[in-house]
């Protein structure tokens, strides 16, 4: 519930509001100019005049009407939320689930059977479970209602996982259709696969050498490197959920002059090795991790996935901009399989689409909407940033505006521009510091880099003496473009006695 009105009692609030657990009070300047009597808004239901009032209050306090609107969105429609970085999308998703569990009519009773959530990494899935558990714990402390203790217990069983793990959980329930036993397991083993590539490539090269004794001398790269490239090529297709076993060499067009026998390698090495590997997994009662999305998509599109036990009412998908075409097709197909009661809640930001090398595209939202049409969707946005200095956001806006004008990214100022009330202690000149150095002169580059890093560390230590900082505020992040940059920086840091913690992203399974 949300109440608006006057209270002349001696409530003391710092800044513009006060909060404890899930209870919040916002102090609205000159509220008597906005409202003449107390107003109660229950479960987000209110007339247009009150919605206008809520937007006004949102503009002058920390109350976020965008989040409130998403939390109480209609339950009979698909929801699409475009959420910029640091705008509280996780909070909004958690609040939405809380609303679904607490609303007066048709509330979620069986959270394990009614709600599923798909995240992009294992770390994100774990973070979501922790946030939900904490929220329900707060509810229990406030109300002493045993309902929330049961919800806390359900957190160990709720389906919150990466899309790969979600696909695997569905496949394991339906493994008999794939010729596997009920106790099938997932495998990410690669040794046997490499052995198959090695054997088929050696056989191919041997046959070529018999046809042409000079064939080995005419090869432009070592055999071991050719073997690695063939596996990498196949993996790139799997990353885009493309099953090479169903293709033929004709699908790849004319071979280049650099590797004129490439199409033969596809037929004689890659496809044969992958078919043998798939058969070996099946014989061992295993599901290949790389192929799980292809297998679940095949079952969904052919309408062969068993519906029994799959009756989710709400499916949440985080970081939707990073899904590829097959994943989108699978998610929307699963929604129809789960039944008419199932509604999607997808969240993402096309500006953060960084997995296009895996098949993600800037049209991810459009492709999801096109399945049933716009009439089945309600659209929301989040653009109040809680993380970044306002001055930086203004600079980013200038960059995004130019990218939008060039059609590099979709960007509309009204809906996409991020706002913030945060002003850090840095001067305007120190918000972005440019260090000019040429990577070809490695010694000079690393000297300059670590000199700057030590300078920032000293400033951070001085700041820690003046005020208490969180773990995140005391952390310096180093972002690189390639993984080999990480190894080089860590190696140079060790020489200088600096410890750098390496994080290369969360696992997909």
Predicted regions and their residues:
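Conserved helicase/translocase P-loop NTPase motor core
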Residues: 164-167, 193-197, 266-314, 326-330, ...
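Short coil/turn segments at secondary-structure boundaries
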Residues: 85, 182-184, 213-220, 243-253, ...
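A ubiquitous short alpha-helical element
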Residues: 80-82, 116, 186, 257-265, ...
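Core structural elements
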Residues: 158-168, 222-239, 296, 478-488
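Conserved P-loop NTPase-based nucleic-acid remodeling module centered on helicase motor cores
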Residues: 113-219, 363-367, 394
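Accessory nucleic-acid engagement/destabilization modules that flank
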Residues: 1-35, 143, 156-162, 199-207
């Amino acid at each position: 519930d949300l109440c608006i009105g006057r209270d002349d009692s001696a409530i003391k609030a710092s800044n513009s509001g006060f909060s404890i657990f899930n209870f919040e009070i916002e102090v609205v300047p000159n509220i008597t100019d906005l409202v003449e009597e107390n107003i109660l808004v229950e479960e987000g239901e209110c007339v247009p005049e009150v919605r206008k009032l809520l937007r006004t209050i949102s503009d002058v306090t920390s109350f976020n009407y965008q989040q409130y609107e998403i939390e109480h969105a209609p339950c009979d429609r698909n929801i699409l939320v475009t959420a910029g970085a640091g705008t509280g999308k996780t909070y909004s998703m958690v609040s939405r689930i809380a609303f679904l569990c607490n609303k007066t009519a048709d509330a979620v009773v069986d959270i394990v059977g009614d709600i599923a959530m798909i995240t992009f990494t294992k770390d994100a899935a774990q973070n979501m479970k922790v946030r939900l558990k904490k929220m329900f714990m707060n509810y229990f402390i406030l109300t002493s209602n045993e309902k929330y203790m049961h919800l806390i217990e359900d957190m160990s069983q709720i389906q919150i996982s990466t899309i790969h793990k979600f696909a695997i959980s569905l496949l394991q329930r339906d493994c008999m259709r794939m010729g596997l036993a009920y106790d099938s397991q997932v495998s990410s083993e690669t040794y046997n696969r490499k052995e198959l590539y090695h054997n088929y490539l050696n056989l191919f090269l041997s046959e070529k050498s018999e046809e042409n004794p000079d064939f080995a001398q005419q090869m432009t790269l070592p055999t071991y490197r050719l073997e690695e490239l063939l596996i990498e090529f196949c993996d790139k297709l799997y990353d885009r959920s493309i099953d090479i076993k169903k293709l033929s060499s004709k699908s790849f067009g004319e071979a280049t002059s650099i590797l004129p026998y490439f199409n033969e390698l596809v037929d004689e090495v890659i496809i044969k090795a992958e078919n043998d590997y798939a058969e070996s997994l099946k014989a061992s009662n295993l599901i290949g991790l790389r192929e799980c999305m292809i297998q679940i998509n095949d079952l969904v599109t052919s309408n062969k996935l068993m519906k029994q036990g799959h009756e989710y009412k709400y499916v949440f998908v985080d970081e939707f901009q990073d899904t590829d075409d097959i994943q989108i097709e699978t998610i929307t197909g699963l929604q129809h399989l789960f039944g008419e009661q199932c509604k999607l809640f997808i969240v993402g930001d096309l500006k953060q689409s960084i997995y296009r090398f895996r098949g993600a595209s800037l049209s991810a939202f459009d492709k999801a909407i096109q399945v049933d049409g716009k009439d089945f969707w309600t659209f929301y946005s989040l653009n109040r940033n809680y993380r970044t200095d306002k001055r930086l956001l203004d600079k980013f806006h200038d960059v995004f505006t130019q990218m939008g004008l060039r059609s590099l990214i979709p960007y509309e100022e009204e809906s996409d521009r991020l706002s913030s009330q945060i002003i850090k202690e840095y001067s305007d000149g120190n918000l972005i510091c440019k260090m000019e150095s040429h990577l070809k002169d490695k010694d000079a580059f690393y000297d300059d880099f670590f000199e700057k890093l030590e300078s920032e560390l000293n400033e951070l230590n001085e700041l820690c003496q003046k005020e208490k900082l969180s773990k995140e505020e005391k952390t310096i992040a180093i972002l690189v473009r390639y993984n080999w940059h990480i190894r080089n920086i860590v190696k140079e840091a060790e020489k200088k006695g600096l410890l750098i913690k390496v994080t290369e992203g969360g696992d997909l399974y």
